[in-house]
Amino acid sequence: MAASPGSGSANPRKFSEKIALHTQRQAEETRAFEQLMTDLTLSRVQFQKLQQLRLTQYHGGSLPNVSQLRSSASEFQPSFHQADNVRGTRHHGLVERPSRNRFHPLHRRSGDKPGRQFDGSAFGANYSSQPLDESWPRQQPPWKDEKHPGFRLTSALNRTNSDSALHTSALSTKPQDPYGGGGQSAWPAPYMGFCDGENNGHGEVASFPGPLKEENLLNVPKPLPKQLWETKEIQSLSGRPRSCDVGGGNAFPHNGQNLGLSPFLGTLNTGGSLPDLTNLHYSTPLPASLDTTDHHFGSMSVGNSVNNIPAAMTHLGIRSSSGLQSSRSNPSIQATLNKTVLSSSLNNHPQTSVPNASALHPSLRLFSLSNPSLSTTNLSGPSRRRQPPVSPLTLSPGPEAHQGFSRQLSSTSPLAPYPTSQMVSSDRSQLSFLPTEAQAQVSPPPPYPAPQELTQPLLQQPRAPEAPAQQPQAASSLPQSDFQLLPAQGSSLTNFFPDVGFDQQSMRPGPAFPQQVPLVQQGSRELQDSFHLRPSPYSNCGSLPNTILPEDSSTSLFKDLNSALAGLPEVSLNVDTPFPLEEELQIEPLSLDGLNMLSDSSMGLLDPSVEETFRADRL
C-alpha cells in the first residue's frame, strides 16, 4: 500500500490527463481573453472612428476638404457611421414633408420653441437629408442633450477652436447671426428633424421634420434653386477677400449678404492666398503702378550727365489734377531743358466720393521734349516768331480726356535705351516745331550757362492771366494756333512712342513756366488742402526724381514749399476752389540741396497702415 502513491504518481496516463485538463483550461481562458480583447478592440475602433469624425476635420487648425462638398455629397456617405446612411436615404428626394406632430406628438420638446438656435455645418447637412434651404447658421451654442456619440457630429464640426476660425471671427464684420433670422432658427424642415431626431436604440437617428417657419427662411421658397443662392453668393462677395479661399465648390452657401462665412466665399477670386485687390478701395500715397521691373527708383541724383534728362517724366492723375506746372531747378539740366518744357493743366474734376481720387494715373506719362526719342527729323512743323519765350506744349485734356488719356501715354514706353548722341543740341532742326526763340535759347549740353542767363528771359515773360472760371484748365499766354501739332507731327510722335496716342483736340497751348525736374502736382480736394513732396519710386524715370504731392495731414505745405523752393522766377498754381486764400501760390525753384533732401532714402513712401492691411490678409 505504501508503493501505491508512488505507482500512482508514476502513472503516465494520469499525468497526461492532468496535462490535457490544464491545456484545455488554458485554451478556454485564452479564447475568452481573445474574445474580450476582440470586443474591446472593436469598441475602441468604433469609438476612434467617431472621434475622428468629430475632431479630424478641424484638428490643428487645418481647413476641411470642401472642394467636392456641394457637387458630390454621396461620396461622403459610405465612410461615415451606419446611422448616416440611414438618415441620408430615409427621406431622400422628398421635397414636401408632413409636419412632425403627425408622427410623434408626444415627443415635442422645447427645441421647437421660437428662439432656439440649432448648431450645424456643411458636413451634417450633406448626408442628413436633401437640403431645401442652403443656409447653415454658425456660432450658436451646442445642443443641450446628447444621447449618442454620433449625435453631435455636426456640432463638433463647428470650427470654433482652430486658427482659421479665429481668422474668420476676427475679420467678420457681422459676428452675430449673419443670416438675420431675428434670433430664431433659420433651419428648414429637414434640418429641424435631424436636430430633434430620436434615437431608436440601435445607433440610428430617426429624423423627423419640424415646423417650417417662413420668417426664418427669409421669404425664400422651400425648394430653393441652386441658381438663386449662387447669385446671392456672388452678391455677397462685395466684402473684403479672405486669404483662405478654396477653389472649386463653395462649402457654405448662404442667404443674403453673409460675411460671417468669409473664408469660403472666394469663388470669384483667384483661389490663392494673396488678396484680391481689384475691388479694394483705399487712399494710397503711391502714385504709380507697382512695377517691379524698375530698378532706377532709388537714384535721385541729378548729376551733370544729360543721360538723366530724357527720363524726366511725371505721373498725372486724370481725376485729381487741376493744374500741373513745371519749373527748373538744377543748372546741370537747365541748358538742355531750356524752354523745352512740358506742362500739363488738367481739368479739376473733384471726386469727393471716391477715396482714391487723388491717386495718380499710372499710365499717364508726360515726356520732356528734350527726350532723345523725339529725334531730329521727325519733329518738323511750322515755327512762328513771338516776342515772349516759348509757351510749353500743354497736354490739357477736356472732359472727354478720361477716355482719351487712358491710351495716350503709357508707362511702358522705352526711354532709357536711346543713345546720348540723339540728345538735344544746338541744332535747330531737332525742335523745328517750336518757335525760333526757343530754338535760339537751346544750348549745347557741355557748356552750361549761368542761371542768370537762363532765368532772365523768363522774367520778361507775361504771366498767365488768372481766369479759372473762363478756362479752368489753366489760362494760356499764347493763342491756340501757336502750338497746334499737325497730323504729320502727331504721326511722327506716334512712331517714336508706339503705345502713345496724341489727341489733336486736346493739344492746346498752356502757360509758360520753366522746367523743374520734380514736377509739382496740384490735385483735387484731397490734395489741395495738404501737400508733401515725395519722390515716386515706381516709375520708369531713370535717375531723375518725380515729385508728387500725395495726401498728407499738414496744412503748412505752403510754408514748406516757399522755404524749400527758394528763388523761382515764376511758377504759379492756379487754384479755383478749396484754398482759403484767393491769391496765387508762388513756388520757388528747388535747389540741389532740396533735391538731396528729397532723395533721402529714410523717407518712408508707404503708409504703415497700408502695409498692415496687406499683412492682415495673410494671417
Curated annotation (Swiss-Prot):
Phosphorylation/dephosphorylation states of Ser-273 are required for regulating transduction of CREB activity. CRTCs/TORCs are inactive when phosphorylated, and active when dephosphorylated at this site. May be phosphorylated at Ser-391 by MAPK3/ERK1 and/or MAPK1/ERK2 or by some cyclin-dependent kinases such as CDK1,CDK2 or CDK5. Following adenylyl cyclase activation, dephosphorylated at Ser-162 and Ser-273 resulting in its dissociation from 14-3-3 proteins probably promoting CRTC3 translocation into the nucleus. It is found in: Nucleus; Cytoplasm. Residues 103-150, 165-185, 375-431 are annotated as: Disordered. The keyword Transcription regulation applies. There is a cross-link at K232 (Glycyl lysine isopeptide (Lys-Gly) (interchain with G-Cter in SUMO2)). Its main location: nucleus. Keywords: Activator, Cytoplasm, Host-virus interaction, Isopeptide bond, Nucleus, Phosphoprotein, Transcription, Transcription regulation, Ubl conjugation. GO terms for cellular component: cytoplasm; cytosol; nucleoplasm; nucleus. Residues 165-175, 405-431 have a biased composition (Polar residues). GO terms for molecular function: cAMP response element binding protein binding; transcription coactivator activity. One of its GO terms (biological process) is macrophage activation. Changing Y282F: Translocates to the cytoplasm. Represses basal TORC3 activity towards CREB. Predominantly expressed in B and T lymphocytes. Highest levels in lung. Also expressed in brain, colon, heart, kidney, ovary, and prostate. Weak expression in liver, pancreas, muscle, small intestine, spleen and stomach. Residues 1-103 are annotated as: Required for interaction with HTLV-1 TAX. The keyword Nucleotide-binding does not apply. The modification Phosphothreonine is found at T160. The modification Phosphoserine is found at S4, S62, S162, S273, S329, S332, S370, S391, S396, S410, S443. Belongs to the TORC family. Binding, as a tetramer, through its N-terminal region, with the bZIP domain of CREB1 enhances recruitment of TAF4 to the promoter. 'Arg-314' in the bZIP domain of CREB1 is essential for this interaction. Interacts (when phosphorylated at Ser-162 and Se-273) with 14-3-3 proteins. Interacts with YWHAE. Interacts (when phosphorylated at Ser-391) with phosphatase PP2A catalytic subunit PPP2CA and regulatory subunits PPP2R1A and PPP2R2A. (Microbial infection) Interacts with HTLV-1 protein Tax; this interaction enhances tax transcriptional activity. Transcriptional coactivator for CREB1 which activates transcription through both consensus and variant cAMP response element (CRE) sites. Acts as a coactivator, in the SIK/TORC signaling pathway, being active when dephosphorylated and acts independently of CREB1 'Ser-133' phosphorylation. Enhances the interaction of CREB1 with TAF4. Regulates the expression of specific CREB-activated genes such as the steroidogenic gene, StAR. Potent coactivator of PPARGC1A and inducer of mitochondrial biogenesis in muscle cells. This is CREB-regulated transcription coactivator 3. The gene is CRTC3.
